[in-house]
Amino acid sequence: MDILKNKIVINELFEKGKYLSNGSVMIKFLESDSNGFLFAVSSKKFKRAVDRNRIKRLMKESARKINVNNKRIAFVYIGEGLPTFEIINNSINNLLSKIWS
């Protein structure tokens, strides 16, 4: 699993990418020659870094098993309150099934 770190690549993903959303997770995705993931949680909604890091770890674990070819995907948590792994996993799987169908 490759993590997106280049600012130019991230800006291109958010400017040109398409998005899907449900109640707790938003996904921005863009077809490209390489693949990579980005995980984000708003610091306005979650003041403590411990909470933000936990949510990002849950999203990473859910996305770890995904085999993506030639897509850059940003996972942004937009829900309220601390989620469980089941909530994150179901949200991400539902959104990814919409991308590939």
Over which residues does each language-model region extend?
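Positively charged, solvent-exposed patches that mediate nucleic-acid binding
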Residues: 1-101
